[in-house]
Amino acid sequence: MPYKYGRRPPKNTPALRFGRFLARTVPAYPPQEDYLANLSGWQMLGNDVAGDCNAVTWANMRRLVTATLTTENYPTQAQVWQFYQTQNPGFDPNGTSSTDGPGSGDDQGMDVQTGLEYLHATGGPDGVKAVAFAKVDHTNLDEVKAALAIFGALWLGIQVLDANQHEFAEGRPWTDVAGSPIDGGHAILGGGYTAADIKFITWAKETEFARSFWNGVVQGTPLVEEAWVVIWPEHLGTRAFEQGVDQAQLAADYQALTGNQLVLSQ
C-alpha cells in the first residue's frame, strides 16, 4: 500500500548548530548502536491517511527518549492530531477529502523547523517543552553519529523516492535508485547507526538507509535535507549530555540567536 508523507520544504531560517556546541573532546561512541531495538509496537498514528509525518515523528521521539531515560510515554493519536493542527488549524481527522479531513485542502503537512519552534515555545500536547533544538550537519557522518550517541534520536527530513516505497514493502534498506522520481517529502525518527547505515522508524516499522541514500542527490536536491537534535528535559544531567555538550557554548549561541538566556536546570 502507498503510505503518506507530509513534510513541507524547509524554511531554513537561522537556528542553532549542533557542531558549534559539540564538546571538543567527544566521548567515544560505539561503532554501531540501535536505540530503537528495545522497543516494539510502533504505531502508524495516521500517516497512512494524512500528511502528519512530522507530528508522528514528535510522538515517536518522545516515546524513544522517555523509554530510554525515564518512563516510557507514547503520545496518543489524539495528541498527534493536536500537534498536527498547530500548522493545519482547519484539519479534522474525522472529515473527508472533500471537506476538511485527510486528503483535503486542510491536510497540508508541516514544516519541521516551525514545529520545533512551537515545541520549544509552547510545548507539545504531552505538556513537555523542548529545551532547545539544533541543526546537525547531515553530510558529516561523524557529527550525525555523535548526535545519536548523545541524544539517542534525530529528527530527519528527507525526500522519498518512488522506489523506496517498494524497498520498504520488501523490508530492504532504502537506497538511491537511479531514475526513480521523488515521491514526496517526509519526516522520520533516526534512532541508530552501523558503519554503513542509519536506522530509522517510519510507518510503524524500523528500517535503515543505505549509504547511497544518505549521500544521494536527485535533480540537485539531497535526499536527506534536514537533521535536527532536540534537547528534552530528560537529557539534562545525563552522562552523555554532560560529557558531549559544551553547555557554555550552547548557552552563548542560544542567547545570540534568541536574545534570551537558556535554562539548563532540570
Segments the model singles out, each with a brief description of its role:
Residues 1-266:
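Catalytic-core signature of thiol
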